[in-house]
Amino acid sequence: MLKNNHTKKLYEKIEKDTEGYLKKAADWSIELAKEIAKKEKIVLTNDHWTVINFIRKFYFKFNITPSMRMLIKSIEKKIGLKKSNSIYLFRLFPEGPAKQASKIAGIPKPSRCL
């Protein structure tokens, strides 16, 4: 419980934009991601983490979030063809795979998201 309170307080203190995206990707941690997911009403599974980790790696390599097409192609390679479609990704991240996963991954809101 103490760790949860600490993470919650940390989340409150960290600088975010008006929509809750971290302003500094360096502030991100796994515990913080879990707290953000909780606020987004998402229980993280291995499939969520596959998407989150891919988005973080892509962002730090190219300094931009991946397009939906890139995300689907990567997920196809990582977790299989049946799960590599936009319908499945929307089940994981109902508010939008790129948008919601980016928020949980601690990177800026994708410029392609409204």
Curated annotation (Swiss-Prot):
Pfam families xrefs: DsrC
E.C. code: 2.8.1.-
GO BP terms: tRNA wobble position uridine thiolation
Enzyme class: transferase
Family membership noted in the UniProt record: Belongs to the DsrC/TusE family.
Subunit annotation: Interacts with the TusBCD complex. Interacts with MnmA.
Protein name: Sulfurtransferase TusE
Record organism: Buchnera aphidicola subsp. Schizaphis graminum (strain Sg)
